[in-house]
Amino acid sequence: MDRGLSTGTHNDNEGLRERPVASQSASTLSPEALTATGDVEPKDTGKELKTYGRTPDGTVFTVPQTHDMVSQLLSPSEPKNLSDIIVLAILGAHILLIWALPKGAKVPVSAVLYLFWRAGYNAGIGWLLHNQSHHKTLVRWAEKTKIFVNPATGQNPHPHLYNLIKRELETKIPHDYSFEKAPLEYNTWLVFRRLVDLILMCDFTSYCLFAIACSHHPVNESLLMTVLRWFSGIVLVLFNLWVKLDAHRVVKDYAWYWGDFFYLIDQELTFDGVFEMAPHPMYSVGYAGYYGISLMAASYKVLFISIIAHAAQFAFLVFVENPHIDKTYNPPPPRKRTIDQDTASTTTHTTDSPIAPAPVDENVPHAPTFSSRPPPSVHNLLGFHNLDLYRITDTSSMLVQFLVFAVTVLTPSTPWYQFLFVANAAVWRLWYSVGIGYLLNRQSNCKAWTRHFVKYGETPHEAWNQWKGTYHLSMIMCYASFIAAVWKMYTLPSDWGYGLVLLRHVLGAGLICLQIWTSVSIYESLGEFGWFYGDFFYDESPKLTYNGIYRFLNNPERVLGLAGVWGAVLITSSGAITFLALLSHILSLAFIQFIERPHMQKLYGQSIRRDAGLVKNLKRSLPPPLKQLHGSMDKIVDGSFEFIEDFLENARPKLAAGVDTFVKDTTALFQKYPARVTITRIDEDVAGYDSRDYSLEVEGTDSSALAECDQSSGREGANARMPLDRRGDLKNLVFEYGAPIKVKWTAPLNHSKKDWIGLYRVTDNTSREITKVSSQGRWIAVNEGSYDNLTCEKGIVSSDVVIPAPHGDNREMASGEVIFSSDKLFWTQGVFEFRYHHNGKHNVMAISRPFEIRIRRFEEEGHHEMMQTSVENSLLPVVRNCFDRDPEVAPETVDEQFGSLVERDGKYAKRVVFAVHQMFGIEFAPEVVRADGTVRNLAWRICNAKKVLAPYNRS
């Protein structure tokens, strides 16, 4: 079946640097740029169309043609410059070093060299790109050093470096490029390219040197094995070379060197060839050559270091590439806004809501609500983070896994027990494919599963939930019993170096990892709805789209989804496990052919794609005779399946009577990456400043009336109940939860431009002179351009505004304002303070008045309808604060939908559930906030939860 079913939008951004360029407004582009973007039809002018780039500030420029690093370095036709000579000299030094070393030192030295350059690639370049993506660090370095400013202006302190860079770059790009006219971002990217060239060339060269140092001919290896080993290795290397060349043909130097971290091109990018064959081809199949070289070297050392390098490359993809791709090309869609506010305002506010049960439910508690739409996915089943031992499905799954584990470990591995475990695994595989397949077939044809629950007064949603539990438990038992059988059949090798023992284990582990990755990719593409075959239960199915892994394969579970069972075959070398693997594969293919495909054809018809990206490319590459052979084989296979279908159709009445009665009935991931590592340092020149010249004044959304009401609660002594006797005009500062806080600062005119203000709990720091606790990103610089990131400048309102000094002093002071909001706030209750720090260090020059963040406790009203209205009114400003008052996320009214960013970033929902817990004493999961989608729905849920829990809250 083409399970390219997705509840999300179509997303094709699955290849390495495979980035569709964000379209720009046609009115802001030149005619040439409009031609490049396709907004204007190109005219036949006899000239080659040029590519136009766009910097973040909107500057449009011509992107000159450049060449790949191998051609630049080694091709005699390409001009050479000093940086090329330096790179070639470093490469030559590597070769000479390995050649000159004694035999015993070649392997460790070459390994250290390679690991150094690999770390320079994945950690070094990764760190630079991460900071460039988030803070424009490289461009800011160029701005601060002024290395691209013409020395004729007198502003460049490095004229010789300017001339050197100018000569180097213009030598490499003789056409359509002017160093003086090119944007700062483009010149910075060109310099960054030279660093990348050095690291990548040294990385590959040191790897090859390590492989040469480790290469040997295995003892007693037959001639046939040697030929096969070298032939396979050469094929993998040639395939790797084709992947690299084809990828460069598609993405050019712009994406090859991560150009979109610096600027965008006003041109639609097309991705074909290797980008239709595999996800992230440069990082997945693009490393096949490493394993080919490992084969030719016949060295496990080379194999293991190749695996380490490949894993590091995937880490680079996950932590650097993918976040930038999502930020640049996958912004959240515009939020759904209320079309007619007047209509919304006149709607009667009853206990009903879009998610509330109909009024009839108040009188008939178990009345079913029939809906063709799937319920919102709030409490998912899959994943350790969704484990909930209060749920019977999860408890049952954990118990049966524990029982399987206990029986497996506590019983001996005798032939009789091995037979029992293999038979048990075979039975569960038969149930998982044949039994579940039968149930789904009945559900597809006559809604048998849903009808059973409706017959007993349940809802289709209840039938769906019970089905998910049944399928989940069946899947758990299928794989748990298979793993138990593998455990019983496995024997730990006595000699890991004998024959292919170690290789079999490495390949087996790799296949198991491949199946895990495939399953995760399938789940990410289909979601909970598609994973549990939701379109068998709900007629209103989402549009059939092909994204994620389904962009490349129609049925990834057909081959890749069972790679792990064949990995177990390699590891165990057992005939019984081979039988289980064959049984699993045959049954899975039959399940796809007889259950999934007919249902998909009935549901989606002609919209089902015949060939996925990989198959299309393979067919395109086949010669005509092989294409004809492929067509003949397709006819044979289709005819065979038709025969089997006819046979089963005729036998169905005889089997139905017996089969129809068969079935009737923690992780949490937290991430806390401090944006600032705090090390206590005392600045030597702090003595030249008077701390009395520094001050901080705090302003926020006032909530002090709540504090004043709480001061006299009747729990204090008689004197404490009296009004406060204030000897000044100051009053307690109590601000709303999540509301932005403005900080006004004053400092001497000669204050350091690297001064900064941090937010802390009052109890965090015992010292008033030095801050010894990390700000964890809750800090703002007082001046722009002083630090190499943009995050610390978010919130600056004004800087260095000259004002007269207070207290009548005949001098002037500098002042400014910053606003702390969003991630720069503490999302909890407590007492906090701001600290003004000197010169980028942690010497405290001023501390603000302490202020309290408090969430007002909701006061209940008697009437339910009035209570819900009050809850809505109290909840709306809190939700808006939790959503940073962002117009693309925060609702303006109680009926307005939350922005789509709430679905993508879990912090917003977590803020809301904390506030709800403090206000109403009701604890929700973050998924509830995302599922409700509006303040009104959430208020309805709160009111009903309080009504349900009221009997248990009585004191």
From Swiss-Prot:
Compositionally biased intervals (Basic and acidic residues): 11-20, 40-51
Single GO MF descriptor: phosphatidylethanolamine N-methyltransferase activity
Pfam families in UniProt: PEMT
GO biological process: methylation; phosphatidylcholine biosynthetic process
Catalytically driven reaction(s): a 1,2-diacyl-sn-glycero-3-phosphoethanolamine + S-adenosyl-L-methionine = a 1,2-diacyl-sn-glycero-3-phospho-N-methylethanolamine + S-adenosyl-L-homocysteine + H(+)
Compositionally biased intervals (Low complexity): 341-352
Annotated spans, Disordered: 1-61, 328-358
Bias (Polar residues): 1-10
Keyword Endoplasmic reticulum listed: yes
Pathway it works in: Phospholipid metabolism; phosphatidylcholine biosynthesis
Membrane topology, Cytoplasmic segments: 103-108, 216-222, 298-299, 411-418, 494-495, 596-955
Membrane topology of the entry: Multi-pass membrane protein
Documented EC number(s): 2.1.1.17
GO CC entries: cortical endoplasmic reticulum; endoplasmic reticulum membrane; perinuclear endoplasmic reticulum
InterPro entries noted in UniProt: Phopholipid_MeTrfase, Phosphatid-EA_MeTrfase_fun
Principal subcellular localization: endoplasmic reticulum
Residue ranges that the UniProt entry lists as topological domain Lumenal: 1-81, 130-194, 244-276, 321-388, 442-472, 517-574
PROSITE patterns, sorted: SAM_CHO2 (PS51598)
UniProt keyword list: Endoplasmic reticulum, Lipid biosynthesis, Lipid metabolism, Membrane, Methyltransferase, Phospholipid biosynthesis, Phospholipid metabolism, S-adenosyl-L-methionine, Transferase, Transmembrane, Transmembrane helix
Subcellular location: Endoplasmic reticulum membrane
Membrane-spanning residues: 82-102, 109-129, 195-215, 223-243, 277-297, 300-320, 389-410, 419-441, 473-493, 496-516, 575-595
Function: Catalyzes the first step of the methylation pathway of phosphatidylcholine biosynthesis, the SAM-dependent methylation of phosphatidylethanolamine (PE) to phosphatidylmonomethylethanolamine (PMME).
PANTHER family: PHOSPHATIDYLETHANOLAMINE N-METHYLTRANSFERASE (PTHR32138:SF0)
Family: Belongs to the class VI-like SAM-binding methyltransferase superfamily. CHO2 family.
Protein name: Phosphatidylethanolamine N-methyltransferase
Source organism of this protein record: Aspergillus terreus (strain NIH 2624 / FGSC A1156)
Lineage: Eukaryota, Fungi, Dikarya, Ascomycota, Pezizomycotina
